[in-house]
Amino acid sequence: MATRIRLQRHGRKSYAFYSIVIADSRAPRDGKFTEKIGTYNPNTNPATVDLNFERALHWVLVGAQPSDTVRNILSREGVYMKKHLLGGVAKGAFGEAEAEAKFEAWKNNKQSGLSALKAKEEEAKKAEAKARLEAEKKVNEVKAKALAEKKAAEEAAKAAAEAPAEEAAPAEETATEAAAE
């Protein structure tokens, strides 16, 4: 039986997530499978992978062929690194303890790189939000200034309209007083 490690699609239209399965290469994509070893969700940033590492390593060691995407996932998760180190142990190049130490060092290095990337993304997001807030404050200041100028112009026009009316009113009073005398 030609065994493949591949993705099995789930989810709704335009929002797929996948199960990582072991299946016969002749079985259809979403058909019968031997074992489910994990899930892969490409919709998150970065993509979320939940993988049973031991079972994935077992199937790679017994010769299951992964699809291209699954090969990238397994490589990123360290399955191929572990296989490489176990091959070195089998050849006698180094001991199993040294292989474990190398694998842990590789894993820690990978995790630190991912955490640095995540921190950088968070920092960029905060900087963008701060810049957006500053731009909004400037726009609001301009709007407030324009509104204040408009109100001042309305007040000036209102005062100018009232001033001639007040001057005309005393003139009429004096005219009526003079006529009364």
Swiss-Prot record:
GO molecular function, one term: structural constituent of ribosome
Keywords: Ribonucleoprotein, Ribosomal protein
GO biological process assignments: translation
Disulphide linkage map: none
InterPro entries in alphabetical order: Ribosomal_bS16, Ribosomal_bS16_dom_sf
A GO term from the CC aspect: cytoplasm
Pfam family name, one: Ribosomal_S16
Biased composition (Low complexity): 158-181
PANTHER family: 30S RIBOSOMAL PROTEIN S16, SMALL RIBOSOMAL SUBUNIT PROTEIN BS16M
Family to which this protein belongs: Belongs to the bacterial ribosomal protein bS16 family.
Protein name in UniProt: Small ribosomal subunit protein bS16
UniProt source species: Bacteroides fragilis (strain YCH46)
Name of the gene encoding the protein in the UniProt record: rpsP
